[in-house]
């Protein structure tokens, strides 16, 4: 926070979430730059009423204009620079996946998944989306002795060098005992055919910010002997599913750790420094 004063003559901080667009407009006022949390959005309506804005720093992940909480295309038309960050909260998410999977397999605080405790050793783990977090989950599972395969938009040489097998999506789903979906926000890959390929007696993790499935197909799959883990309601999709006996949703963002906030702050300030030259 103190470092921000080296970039501007005046800094105004708000610690609460604005109630709506008009409150955001009032808060921005005649500011040249805006720093924005993931909890709020800056749309075209807001930007049209804040003509002085020249820079928007997203203090959250930016993967694509479609998934952003800023109307990036309109901002670019106006000559407004929009920056975002990535890869600041992955470590906590990986720890969550390992922790919940170990508890499930061993039966810590619950019945063991296979009736008797088992290790991750030899477990068939499929990763859907081998980006930064997906790759880290794959590496963690490999460390514990799992057999790793993955689906991504293209085969990755570095993954092959580690012994990870590239598979078509439906083949991967059928092969896997545990599937981890690590996709960008609003990316939906699991529909009726995919859940049919996945089959029953499977464990599904979703570490994304939104559901990786269409809800009707997912709900039917849950009715069988399957289990789904999500850390947040955003990843699960529907409050009605929170009480489903085959859903484990903590409603806590596992990537929001002390270290993640440090990494986030450093990256936001680095973007500001680059913008200022």
Where are the predicted features?
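Rossmann-like adenosine-cofactor binding region
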Residues: 29-32, 42-46, 155-240
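Phosphate/diphosphate ligand-binding glycine-rich loop within oxidoreductases
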Residues: 31-112, 229
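N-terminal glycine-/charge-rich "phosphate-binding" loop or analogous flexible N-terminal tail
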Residues: 1-31, 145, 149
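C-terminal helix-to-coil terminal segments
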Residues: 76, 81-93, 110, 229, ...
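NAD(P)-binding Rossmann-fold cofactor-contacting core
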Residues: 143-160
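Phosphate-coordination loops involved in phosphoryl transfer and adenosine-cofactor binding
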Residues: 53, 121-124, 201
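Glycine-rich NAD(P)-binding loop of Rossmann-like domains
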Residues: 107-137
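Active-site regions of enzymes building and remodeling cell-envelope glycoconjugates
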Residues: 7-13, 54, 160-169, 242-251
